[in-house]
Amino acid sequence: MFHLSSNISIGKLEQVKPANVKWETSVENYVDTCTIDLPRIKYLVTDKLSTEDKSELNSRKEYIVKEGDAVDVLLGYDGRNERRFKGFVRRVVQGIPVRVECEGYAYLLYDVIFNKSYSSTTAKQIVTDLCQDLDIVISNEIPTIPLENVRFKNATGIQVLEWLKNECKLAVYFNFNELYVGTLFGKSQKTVKLRLGWNTIKDNNFKQRELDKNVKINIVEKNVKGEVKRTPADVQKYSNEKDVKVKAGIPSELLKQIANRLQTKSNYGGHQGDIELFLEPFFNKGFVANVDGFRYPEKSGNYFVEAVKGSFGKGGGRQTIQLTFLQQL
């Protein structure tokens, strides 16, 4: 029989014993989240008199856990703990139990004000300048993505990431304290095997996607002279077209990758959805799930882990992985 185990630190507190933990992380979102429920009395300090009710809050009672405290959450079975979340305390909610709301390393960028202009630069240089003096590691796997005529004025760190995601159509996400910017499938990935009905709990939501019509994706960029350039995805049969605007100056080979990624996502007709598991085998976003369909061989194949959410508490440990197509570059 497996026994739940954990190794959680919050600020200066080590081996924190939670009532419940929930976490969520996705390649579509650069803000990882985690909530930790703690026993109320154990994590309060007070100077109440011995005749007062120590379970009641007053102005002389406060929580040991503070906003901005570093948080590290490792969970598993029988001491085989894997890191599920790393970040900072965003807010402490009073109640029974105490709820500690946490965010990943994007938390450090809320108060950053960024003013910088570039005539010619790269996406990696922008995030390197943005994160200087912060405890954020810039991924070595960020591809060279040239950008021209970029200007930020009084932009927050979060707004800079949002610009890279929305204007340049790049994947922007953290792997704990490491920031990655690039194509969705450009980062090295670990492959983990799954067998439906064997080391999974539920796969009812892992279904074949229904398509109404095929759409051809065109990446559209306009330079400073007003000249428009279209980069189409590699698709033969389609019933409609969709233009997606991007920042001018991105290399043509990268534009083709972006177009093909959006094209595959739009017209993908294979299986996708959620699979619920125990805490083992361990998954993180960006992994590849090698699925053995067992009784459903049509579900077999390699899938990209787009998101992971999980829970840990008296009811046991669970993780739900969200699977989608895996584009071969």
List PLM regions with ranges.
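Soluble periplasmic/extracytoplasmic beta-strand elements of cell-envelope proteins
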Residues: T35-D37, D72-L74, K86-R90, R99-E103, ...
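N-terminal export/assembly leaders
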Residues: L109-F114, V127-F152
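Assembly/oligomerization scaffold segments
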Residues: M1-Y107
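Polar, S/T/G-rich
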Residues: T121-T128, Q132-D133, T156-N166, V220-K222
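Short, compositionally biased
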Residues: G87-I96, V150, F185-S188, N302-K314
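An acidic/polar, Gly/Ser/Thr-rich interaction patch typically located in mid-to-C-terminal regions
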Residues: V21-I64, I201-L329
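Short beta-strand-centered interaction patches in the first periplasmic/extracellular domains
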Residues: P97-A106, N140-L211
